[in-house]
Amino acid sequence: MQKSILSSILLLGAVCAQANNYTVTSPNGKLVMNVKCEGGKASYTVDLNGKQMLAASALGLVANYGDFSQGLTMGTLKGAPKHLTYVMDHTKKSHVEKDVYEATIGFLNAKKDSMTLYLHVSDNDVAYKYEMSRPKKDNPKSVIIYKEVSGFNFPEKTTTFLCPQITPMTGWERTKPSYEEEYTPDAQMNVKSQFGVGYTFPCLFKVGEDGWVLVSETGVSSAYPGSRLSDYEPGKGYTVAFPQKGENNGVGSEFAGIPLPGETPWRTITVGASLAPIVETTIPYDVVEPLYEASQNYKPSRYTWSWLIWQDESINYDDQVK
């Protein structure tokens, strides 16, 4: 993948600032993200075509050296319009070119430790992540993140198309969660998930007749666990949840531990009046960079797996070559 980001000389997005309140508008003016800090708590909303896609949804996290979910003071927004272009093989779109707006907002918690919120806004996508700085006191080299309060609070008329998460170390050879449970289409938000442990990314929502929203994550590396969505809670919506205790046969922690300074993965939100922007989005790639350069030009080849056809109980060579 080759990627370049160029500053645009055009007005590709707009920012409106008030005390404890920032409004970021997409390049085409149809998507609006509002970030505010009231009572020491940060939150955001997302509107599309003047219709609310996400109501006030929480921002922040709780770490071992400080609470960044409350007692916050919001600093200055620093941002600029960008023109994003890159080429990548083996994906739904080989050449991507779009206008975006990128920004950062600094926060201080009650102990005056800092957290930076990164924003990426395009015509149908919003993405955000957190950067944690090294505190001056005790100069820790890493941080344990106990939980994110990152929320997705949908209007009450919203219905869901979600894959339920399942409890760990269950199913075939105790390999679950396998992220392949059956889902109920067009379900009500207030119905608890099938196994009571939330839902698997990506998560699709229908906001009445106003549009669709896809919530997911990208930029996950070995430095941070893959996440899921919690069950729905009235007034708060869904929140980012970490792996369950007991996954991976109990090896490792269910918390995130990252070196300092360090970043979380991106939380992505794709919105559209129809499903077209959901299907066509390239946001999983727009906000990340290649981890390394491929040693060769890899080409697809043939493969086989008898279970896909027969649902057989074992896999052997003779069956695979039939």
For the regions a language model picked out, list residue spans one by one.
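Catalytic cores of large soluble enzymes that bind and process phosphate-bearing ligands
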Residues: 118, 260, 296, 315-319
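Generic detector of low-complexity/intrinsically disordered segments
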Residues: 8, 12-14, 206, 231, ...
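Bacterial Sec-dependent N-terminal signal peptides
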Residues: 1-21
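N-terminal accessory beta-strand-rich subdomains and adjacent acidic, glycine-rich linkers
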Residues: 23-286
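Substrate-binding cleft of carbohydrate-active enzyme catalytic domains
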Residues: 300-322
